[in-house]
A protein has these predicted regions:
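Acidic, low-complexity, intrinsically disordered interaction modules
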Residues: 51-81
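Generic structural hydrophobic/aromatic packing signal, biased to beta-strands
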Residues: 42, 62-64, 96
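Short, compact, well-ordered microdomains
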Residues: 70-98
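N-terminal leader/targeting segments
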Residues: 1-58
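Phenylalanine-focused residue identity feature
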Residues: 20-22, 46, 66, 88, ...
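Short glycine-rich, low-complexity/disordered patches
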Residues: 48-60, 89-98
């Protein structure tokens, strides 16, 4: 059996989740704003990093400075929580629409 890719993992765990699920799925809110909650959650999971958390922005999408190796370290529960904040996996990076 082949190993699940990060694209497949994010689709399996968060594919049906949207930011409309934020209030239902996120119990310990760091902010009432889903996007800010996601950024604060990522900061707590990966503490001590320097530089901006937003790596790139284009039109209505931002790419966060977290790559495939970082994504592999996330638990399934964290992926569900991030998905409820509008975070998704795209082009080997975490991303959000805004």
């Amino acid at each position: 059996m082949s190993e699940e890719t990060q694209d497949e993992r994010w689709e399996r765990l968060g594919g049906e989740i949207s930011s409309f699920d934020f209030d239902k799925l996120v119990q310990n809110k760091r902010s009432n704003r889903p996007d800010l909650h996601a950024l604060l959650l990522l900061e707590s999971i990966f503490p001590g990093r320097d530089g901006d958390i937003i790596g790139h922005a284009e039109h209505d999408q931002i790419w966060l400075d977290f790559d495939e190796d970082d994504s592999e370290k996330l638990t399934d529960e964290q992926i569900v929580e991030l998905s409820a904040c509008g975070v998704f996996y795209d082009e080997d990076s975490l991303s959000m629409f805004r």
